[in-house]
Amino acid sequence: MIAASDLKAGMTFEQDGKLIKVMEASHHKPGKGNTVMRMKLKDVRTGSTTDTTMRPDEKVKKAHIDTKPVQYLYSQDDMAIFMDLETYEQYEVPTALIEEELKYLLENMEVKIQFYGEEVIGLTLPTTVILRVAETQPSIKGATVTGSGKPATMETGLVVNVPDFVEADELLEINTAEGTYLKRAK
């Protein structure tokens, strides 16, 4: 059991037979009354999200999540296929379960797959990935004053705001947690 005050973003717990992932968590002290935990929670199995509050001393059962290193092979018919790097066993994961993560995946990329018992519940991406710019607006000379950047579509379909000097076919390092441009890849 774990206290609600100890829950952090990314942790998973069990509640009423559901597997719940904490997306955001913060302490909130209203003008009157006791401190509460404000949280954005996601049901791992259904994908539905809810905003809720809990007392800091409320207890929840922490879920035991195992991870295995796998290699992303390909996607086909609403399934993403991964191969275990140790046993070469293949796992089929519904693309609806990993919809956001798919925007960062290239074939043969190594990631970690998350298990709850025998059930696949998600992926852990590396903190950064290197993706090629598939399409972006051409650079305009002298347009460096604004600094607002421009949208660029990456080879996986991910759209990232990039600086004006970035052009198509360049390799960029992307932060997977926030989906933001970090730098040009070497």
UniProtKB/Swiss-Prot annotation:
<dbReference type="InterPro" id="IPR014722">
    <property type="entry name" value="Rib_uL2_dom2"/>
</dbReference>
<dbReference type="Pfam" id="PF01132">
    <property type="entry name" value="EFP"/>
</dbReference>
<dbReference type="GO" id="GO:0005737">
    <property type="term" value="C:cytoplasm"/>
</dbReference>
<keyword id="KW-0963">Cytoplasm</keyword>
<keyword id="KW-0251">Elongation factor</keyword>
<dbReference type="InterPro" id="IPR015365">
    <property type="entry name" value="Elong-fact-P_C"/>
</dbReference>
<comment type="function">
    <text>Involved in peptide bond synthesis. Stimulates efficient translation and peptide-bond synthesis on native or reconstituted 70S ribosomes in vitro. Probably functions indirectly by altering the affinity of the ribosome for aminoacyl-tRNA, thus increasing their reactivity as acceptors for peptidyl transferase.</text>
</comment>
<dbReference type="InterPro" id="IPR012340">
    <property type="entry name" value="NA-bd_OB-fold"/>
</dbReference>
<protein>
    <recommendedName>
        <fullName>Elongation factor P</fullName>
    </recommendedName>
</protein>
<dbReference type="GO" id="GO:0003746">
    <property type="term" value="F:translation elongation factor activity"/>
</dbReference>
<dbReference type="InterPro" id="IPR013852">
    <property type="entry name" value="Transl_elong_P/YeiP_CS"/>
</dbReference>
<dbReference type="Pfam" id="PF09285">
    <property type="entry name" value="Elong-fact-P_C"/>
</dbReference>
<dbReference type="InterPro" id="IPR020599">
    <property type="entry name" value="Transl_elong_fac_P/YeiP"/>
</dbReference>
<dbReference type="InterPro" id="IPR008991">
    <property type="entry name" value="Translation_prot_SH3-like_sf"/>
</dbReference>
<dbReference type="InterPro" id="IPR001059">
    <property type="entry name" value="Transl_elong_P/YeiP_cen"/>
</dbReference>
<dbReference type="InterPro" id="IPR013185">
    <property type="entry name" value="Transl_elong_KOW-like"/>
</dbReference>
<dbReference type="Pfam" id="PF08207">
    <property type="entry name" value="EFP_N"/>
</dbReference>
<dbReference type="GO" id="GO:0043043">
    <property type="term" value="P:peptide biosynthetic process"/>
</dbReference>
<keyword id="KW-0648">Protein biosynthesis</keyword>
<comment type="similarity">
    <text>Belongs to the elongation factor P family.</text>
</comment>
<comment type="pathway">
    <text>Protein biosynthesis; polypeptide chain elongation.</text>
</comment>
<dbReference type="InterPro" id="IPR011768">
    <property type="entry name" value="Transl_elongation_fac_P"/>
</dbReference>
